Curated annotation (Swiss-Prot):
This is Actin-interacting protein 3 homolog. Residues 202-214, 350-362 have a biased composition (Low complexity). PANTHER family: COILED-COIL DOMAIN-CONTAINING PROTEIN CG32809, P140CAP/SNIP-RELATED. Involved in the organization and/or function of the actin cytoskeleton. Residues 1-55, 177-234, 251-369, 401-486, 505-708, 752-776, 882-903, 1312-1340 are annotated as: Disordered. Residues 1009-1096 form a coiled coil.
Length: 1385
């Protein structure tokens, strides 16, 4: 199938290519291509526009285009008719699909015709997928007229847009062809006219080359004219040549961009299937969510928006089709929902204007605008009341809300209000009223609340309207709107991240020990203190108790309302006439009714409090276990709820104020708001914090020592309060409400009411007077290093107690006595150890120096090992003896008494409790083998020591023994179970990993896995078949034995065959499962390979087109370069010099005008950073190329000389080294070899030394022949040969009178041959070797050294010795020469 398709496509491509080549060859060349002025028109490719078509080719092309368009019109009409018939039920879906296929075929033929004419059709590439998505959406529904009316307008709009585009392109083709025909004769006429003008303008000053003419030189003018005539059409061709289009560069950039975009979705592209494509197209045809979808890109053609003719200010009810599709993926039709239906009467008029089409954010602004009338916070009010709200609002608008755009006459959409999550219950007063706009309500999301807010409490200066029904309705819509929850989450995230950032900064400041920075950061982090004045616990009867209980059953949470407004004056003191009733809400607020004013608060801190409140409320209800009453002591719940609280404590701000006991109703237990809040979680608290101008510190009240409920009132304020009630305003400013409730001291135990109705006999003792800390003392900070309280923490047996002391301990004995008094333990002097915990590292260490013991230190007491074991044994033996004694006594009493007692003895109960404790200990410490072993030893010891007297009833003893056995068996079972648990977990992990590997389709299953699984399955099948053949042979043999030979088969044979058949069945099942496992993986791999094949085909096609674009770009570039080269050669031949630059002077007014113009242009500039960076890079590359091109003439010549290999081949460095080695060897032989051999043989040694010592020539007297020979050697550059004649006066020789040398004795000078000798023979000489050696002692110090390398000749020294030279002396001499050479160098 693929081969046939490839052949067909190859034949089609070859035929098209040959046709296009023939058409191209038949076109005439022309040098200018007209570009349409319309912005939508694309540049015409060179292959289609470099030369105009002939008349026959143009007419044929136009007729082909017209025929294609006509066929396309007919098919579109058939498509509309098929849709109509489909809605009537006369045709099915397949008929519509076949018409669609025909339509797409005609569409592709039409686009191909336009492409041959040089018209780009890229704007129509998305039409097939758009039409397909609309048709799929239509055919999904049941055939009906309603379904057709819903989707038929979309089909018609797509078809109309297609036909209009084709009509426009058809007219464009005709105009271009006509224009190219008319341009050809006109260009010919212009060329002829230019030639005539050149001939006629040689003598005039208005010639065509007047810019290169010097009027003062007739000769130069003639040279210029003749030079310009050598390239007559260079300038004209350069002017008529269009700019380089860079087709290949643009195509490559698009390809790279597509590749980068596809990298992110490579996994999805690799997993594409037919079903997934259909599902994607089906989903793409549905309208997206406007809130979540990004703003669409601007399409090259405007969206088709049909408006009603009678009203242009209203949006059309018909859907709008946005055709800005992404070419990389399957396009989709984005339909804008009708806004006319959703606009309510309360919507501003600006939202109904057509300007919404310009901004996609207007759809969001409609919802935001309609909900922001009554809950909007102005910028000024927000900055004064809530300093941190501006930044948070800005961050919210940046992340979630589209920027405010201009809506109808420059009106800007207002900003969103601050975070307000109001969730009101049906019984809440907020159901009928709303809060003012400057009062955001902060509640945990998803929490129910009962709000007791009075209308009179709102600030009159706020200016908010509460009576408007529209504002109430819009506020409720805004509070219930799910679209703003994400914005609230962003505020929470920003607040939490800001707080974490401050905490990290504080830690860094602490590490750097910067005190000022720490204080400033802590000031930002902490909330401002709330004053303790004017706080009250007032009753609230706005919410019924039943409703409160019903809401609390659904969500047992303590909620809070923090209201923000501005105070004008302080509230007066509250009277004590108000009492606390059960079931009411606790509220601290103004008596004037004003709400709390957070002057220095921030939204981040409020969000943090709400989050802490949520965390506290999500914890289990047993958090308040300290405040629960036992069922036996508290009596019935109804009686407890019927009690009324008339008692309380009073807080006074005066230093002399004391808390006294109220004399009324002392016997009545307290069941007030605190008890109700603790025992009845359905009760709620409403807190409104008040900030006065002079804040004061809260008042602390210690817990009264009485065990019964007492109440006291202050003689000054008489305000009822809760015991140990740290002011709720202060507590709420630093912790959630649930934390405030948990910090309230537990209420005393209430005696149960007497059944007979008599008053309780439990006495109520009077509490001591509670000292009250003054505000001034509380406000003053404690000095550093001074402990106001003196106490230690003592720990023994995992119990820690706080012990107060009057003075610091002086020695370890006092500390031991303190432990003995607290824990009632006895010990000897050295039988215990004391450990202390370091407060910084939390590490315990042995207390050796009492200077480490400070107040508030944690000290642990423990016995040493031996004493600990002994104490443990004594403890166990004491327990056993106590059990024996008590059980024996109780058993005797039971025998004496009657047998009517049904309950077991106390000893048996104690034994059962201890056994339960042991069982719990085993269950908790089952992983510790040593602990289990030790406990078993203790139990065996306890059982052995437990001797039962004969007089004791054996019934209980047998029960205990049975329980002991059961416990031992349970212990064994649990140990075995916990031993198997790690193995089971390990196996389970292996199975999970295998399952994940098999289940994950992204696992590296490639062609290798397919081949390996194929081989494995083949091997398994082969083995199964072989085993099957063996079993078949055995069964056939057994069958023949039974039928023919009448042999009785053995049962062992039949059983074995049954086992083998069962084994084969299992193997077959395994093989089947293997096939089922690999089948989906193989299919997935096939899909990937098919996708890879398609992508590779696309790669080849795209790069083939890219190569064609490169060729066309190269031809255009060559044309422009040839024209520029011709002009450059023309100018180089002419002797005209370039005109010097002349600077024009401007007046001050002109300079001012230029400056203003430049400044205006700078203001109007909209720089593109990416384009500027690209331009900078291009300029840098051009500059580098210019620098590389700057090469002088000498460098060019040397480079050419070396590249052409014009140097003579003389052997190079290797040849020079070889020659030097040969010369060195010759010199060594001449100087030393003969001399050393003669000395060893004892021939003429002394005479040679005497004679050579006498032959010391004058420094300035040189024989002529020797000098010539030396100069000849130096001219040839032979350093080594010249050394034969250079001798140096030895410092060891004794100076003697100079003698006149006899020049006649030198008949033939010793001249070394400069040729490259290979033998060691010397030139013929009249003298012997000794004479040669003596002649070598002559020193030529005045020799003119012409070459630098001959300077080393002066370094050679020959010492005249008066003693016999041996081999050791020769070696020492060489060493001396080396040292001397080094020193000279």
């Amino acid at each position: 199938m693929f081969n046939n398709g490839d052949n067909m496509s190859r034949e089609r491509f070859s035929s098209n290519h040959s046709m296009q080549r023939q058409k191209t060859e038949s076109r005439a060349n022309f040098s200018r291509r007209l570009v349409p002025s319309d912005s939508n028109r694309k540049p015409v490719p060179n292959g289609a526009s470099n030369s105009p078509l002939s008349r026959d080719a143009a007419s044929h092309l136009i007729s082909t285009i017209e025929t294609s368009i006509m066929k396309l019109l007919v098919v579109t009409k058939e498509l509309l008719e098929s849709l109509t018939n489909w809605s009537k039920g006369t045709v099915n879906d397949s008929a519509v699909s076949s018409v669609y296929v025909t339509l797409i075929g005609e569409f592709l033929q039409t686009t191909k015709s336009f492409h041959e004419a040089g018209i780009e059709t890229a704007d129509l590439n998305d039409f097939p997928l758009e039409l397909r998505s609309v048709l799929e959406q239509t055919l999904e529904k049941t055939p009906s007229s309603d379904a057709l009316e819903t989707n038929l307008p979309n089909v018609r709009e797509l078809v109309m847009h297609l036909l209009q585009s084709l009509k426009y392109k058809q007219s464009l083709v005709k105009s271009r062809l006509n224009q190219s025909r008319s341009n050809l004769p006109q260009m010919t006429r212009e060329a002829n006219d230019n030639d005539v003008n050149r001939r006629n303008s040689r003598g005039s000053s208005q010639g065509s080359i007047s810019s290169f003419r010097n009027p003062d030189s007739r000769k130069q003018y003639e040279e210029t004219t003749s030079a310009s005539l050598s390239a007559p059409g260079a300038f004209d061709a350069l002017k008529q040549t269009n700019a380089l289009e860079r087709r290949a560069s643009k195509r490559l950039s698009h390809m790279v961009k597509d590749q980068q975009n596809n990298e992110g979705s490579s996994q999805n592209l690799r997993n594409i299937t037919v079903e997934s494509v259909r599902g994607f197209l089906r989903d793409s045809s549905k309208p997206d969510n406007i809130m979540d979808s990004p703003s669409p890109k601007v399409s090259k053609r405007p969206s088709i928006v049909r408006q009603d003719s009678h009203d242009s200010n209203k949006l059309s009810r018909r859907p709008t089709i946005n055709t800005s599709f992404d070419r990389k993926f399957s396009p989709k039709l984005t339909r804008t929902p009708s806004l006319t239906k959703s606009l309510d009467p309360g919507t501003p008029t600006s939202l109904k204007s057509p300007s919404l089409r310009k901004s996609p954010s207007s759809f969001v602004q409609k919802d935001v605008y309609s909900r922001s009338n009554s809950l909007r916070i102005s910028q000024a009010n927000r900055s004064n009341v809530f300093p941190g709200a501006t930044d948070v609002t800005r961050s919210v608008s940046d992340h979630r809300i589209l920027s405010s755009s201009t809506i109808n006459d420059g009106e800007v959409a207002p900003p969103l209000p601050q975070r307000s999550r109001t969730i009101s219950s049906p019984n809440s007063p907020l159901s009928a009223t709303v809060l003012p706009s400057s009062t955001p309500i902060l509640l945990p999301r998803g929490r129910s609340s009962t709000l007791s807010v009075n209308k009179k409490q709102f600030n009159a200066d706020d200016g908010s309207t509460l009576n408007s029904p529209n504002s109430i309705r819009e506020t409720e819509e805004y509070a219930a709107s799910p679209k703003l929850e994400d914005i609230a989450d962003e505020v929470e995230t920003d607040a939490t991240s800001q707080r974490e950032l401050l905490e990290r900064q504080i830690q860094k400041a602490e590490s750097s020990e910067d005190t000022s920075e720490i204080e400033s950061l802590q000031g930002k982090l902490s909330l401002p203190q709330v004053s303790s004045t004017q706080q009250e616990i007032q009753p609230s009867s706005s919410v019924p108790e039943a409703a409160s209980n019903e809401i609390a059953e659904k969500e047992p949470a303590v909620t809070a309302i923090e209201s923000i407004t501005e105070r004008k004056e302080e509230a007066p003191v509250i009277s004590s006439s108000e009492k606390i009733e059960s079931g009411t809400s606790i509220s601290t607020s103004d008596t004037k009714g004003g709400l709390a004013n957070f002057e220095n608060d921030s939204l981040e801190e409020l969000e943090r409090l709400i989050q802490q409140n949520n965390a506290e409320q999500d914890e289990p209800s047993y958090k308040f276990h300290k405040y629960e009453y036992s069922s036996e002591e508290s009596g019935s719940e109804d009686e407890f709820k019927s009690e009324k609280d008339t008692k309380g404590y009073v807080i006074s701000n005066d230093d002399s104020t004391q808390v006294e006991e109220d004399s009324e109703d002392k016997s009545t237990p307290n069941t007030g708001a605190s008890a109700k809040l603790i025992n009845d979680p359905s009760s709620t608290i409403t807190v409104s914090d008040v900030y006065p101008k002079k804040p004061a510190s809260p008042v602390e009240i210690t817990e009264p020592p009485s065990s019964a409920l007492v109440s006291a009132t202050s003689p000054t304020t008489n305000v009822p309060i809760v015991p140990e009630a740290v002011h709720l305003s202060t507590a709420f400013s630093t912790a959630p409400v649930s934390t405030i409730v948990s910090n309230i001291s537990p209420l005393p135990t209430v005696a149960p009411p007497n059944v007979s109705g008599s008053p309780s006999e439990t006495p109520i003792s009077k509490p001591e007077k509670v000292p009250v800390v003054s505000q001034t003392e509380k406000a003053l900070p404690k000095p550093l290093g001074v402990d106001t309280e003196k106490y230690y923490f003592l720990r023994y047996n995992n119990q820690t107690r706080k012990v107060k002391v009057e003075s610091p301990l002086s020695n370890a004995n006092e500390l031991g006595e303190l432990f003995s008094n607290v824990y009632k333990i006895s010990f000897s002097g050295d039988s215990y150890e004391l450990n202390i915990e370091d407060p910084d590292t939390k590490i315990s260490y042995l207390l050796e120096d009492l200077s480490d013991l400070k107040y508030k230190s944690l000290v642990s007491f423990m016995f040493k090992e031996q004493d600990a074991n002994k104490k443990r044994e004594d403890f166990h033996s004491g327990e056993v003896s106590a059990i024996q004694h008590s059980s024996a006594q109780n058993t005797l009493d039971d025998h004496v008494n009657t047998t009517t007692h049904e309950s077991p003895s106390s000893a048996f109960t104690e034994i059962l409790e201890r056994l339960k404790a042991i069982e719990q200990n085993i269950s908790t410490n089952h992983t510790n083998d040593s602990a289990a072993l030790k406990s078993s030893e203790d139990h065996s010891k306890l059982a052995n020591n437990f001797s039962v007297p004969d007089s004791i009833d054996h019934k209980f003893y047998q029960q205990v023994k049975n329980m002991q056995l059961e416990l031992a068996s349970l212990k064994q079972i649990s140990a075995a179970f916990f031993t198997r648990i790690p193995l089971k977990i390990k196996d389970f992990k292996k199975e999970i990993n295998a399952f994940n590997e098999k289940g994950s389709l992204d696992f590296q299953f490639g062609r290798g896995f397919v081949l390996s699984s194929k081989d494995r399955i083949e091997r398994e099948v082969k083995n199964v078949v072989e085993k099957f053949d063996e079993v078949n042979d055995q069964i056939e043999l057994m069958r023949s034995d039974v039928l023919l030979r009448k042999v009785r088969p053995g049962l062992d044979q039949t059983s074995q065959l049954n086992e083998e058949s069962a084994y084969l069945e299992k193997r077959i099942q395994t093989l089947e499962r293997s096939l089922e496992e690999v089948t989906p993986i193989w299919k997935k791999q096939w899909e990937r390979e098919l996708n890879a094949i398609v992508q590779e085909q696309e790669f080849l096609d795209s790069h083939t087109v890219l190569i064609s674009d490169l060729k066309r770009d190269l031809s255009a570039l060559s044309t422009v370069l040839s024209n520029v080269s011709a002009i450059a050669e023309l100018q180089a031949k002419s002797s005209i010099k370039s005109k010097p630059l002349t600077l024009k002077t401007a007046t001050e007014s002109e300079i001012k005008g230029y400056r203003d113009q430049i400044q205006l242009e700078v203001l109007n500039l909209k720089p593109d950073s990416e384009a500027r960076l690209q331009a900078i890079e291009r300029s840098e590359l051009l500059q580098k190329k210019r620098l590389l091109q700057r090469v002088d003439e000498f460098s060019k010549e040397v480079k050419t000389f070396v590249e052409n290999e014009k140097l003579n081949k003389i052997g190079g460095a290797e040849e020079a080294d070889r020659i030097r080695t040969i010369q060195d060897e010759k010199v060594r032989k001449i100087l030393w070899d003969d001399f050393v051999s003669s000395k060893r043989n004892g021939k003429n040694g002394g005479s040679f030394i005497e004679e050579s010592s006498d032959t010391v020539l004058d420094e300035h007297v040189v024989p002529d022949n020797s000098a010539k020979a030396t100069v000849a050697e130096i001219d040839y550059g032979s350093q080594v040969d010249t050394e034969n004649f250079m001798l140096e006066r030895s410092p060891l020789a004794t100076p003697k009178p100079l003698k006149q040398p006899d020049f006649n004795i030198y008949e033939t000078p010793i001249v070394r041959s400069t040729a490259h000798e290979t033998d060691d023979e010397q030139t013929p000489s009249k003298y012997s070797d000794n004479r040669v050696e003596s002649s070598s002692d002559t020193v030529f110090e005045n020799t003119d050294l012409k070459y630098d390398n001959n300077v080393q000749m002066s370094k050679v020294t020959h010492h005249v010795r008066h003693d016999t030279i041996s081999t050791d002396d020769y070696d020492a001499y060489e060493d001396a020469e080396d040292v001397e050479e080094t020193s000279l160098t």
